[in-house]
Amino acid sequence: IDDSRIPALGVMGAFVFAAQMINFPVGLGTSGHLLGSALLAVTLGPAAASIVMTAILVVQALIFQDGGVLALGANVFNMAVAGVAAAYLPYRLWNSGRLRNPAIFLGAFLSVLAGAVLAVAELLLSGVRMGQTVLGVSLGLFLVTAVLEGVITVAVIRSLEAMRPNWV
């Protein structure tokens, strides 16, 4: 990583860390929060985004007991690997002209869905039983969260482009 990019890693990591710590209840005993994988992938690139997201998740698990130590591996895979990959692919494919903002939105949307589908699959594989109603409600909540993630990510990226164009 170029030394000139180090401030961007710190600032974007701190922003996503703080945003992830703001949880809002979505029912069924769960909460939602900004994921930030797309925001990090677009501003830092996929490799740096994965490293920063992993650091965020480790600090949250070890210091703030958010996410849990036992779930750390799954969370890193879901958000720092799959989430970043799902976010970066549309951005990489369509990062030009009129398709730029829709690509960023789609990447953010897909990052949430990838993480959600993987989390549900991991829970099911671990023996957690979920009824059809719970799965249906969860899917609806994940879709709403994915749309919000896309809107917020595009808004933050556009603001960054106006203030710090060399960061995006």
List each model region and its residues.
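Hydrophobic alpha-helical transmembrane segments
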Residues: 6-11, 35, 50-54, 77, ...
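Short helix-perturbing small/polar motifs within transmembrane alpha-helices
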Residues: 77-119
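Hydrophobic transmembrane alpha-helices
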Residues: 1-39
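Interfacial aromatic-anchored transmembrane helix boundaries in multi-pass membrane proteins
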Residues: 21-29, 55-85
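Membrane-interfacial segments
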Residues: 2, 63, 67, 71, ...
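Alpha-helical membrane-inserting segments
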Residues: 19, 23, 59, 63, ...
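Alpha-helical transmembrane segments and their cytosolic interface
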Residues: 1-9, 133-168
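Alpha-helix C-terminal capping segments
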Residues: 39-48
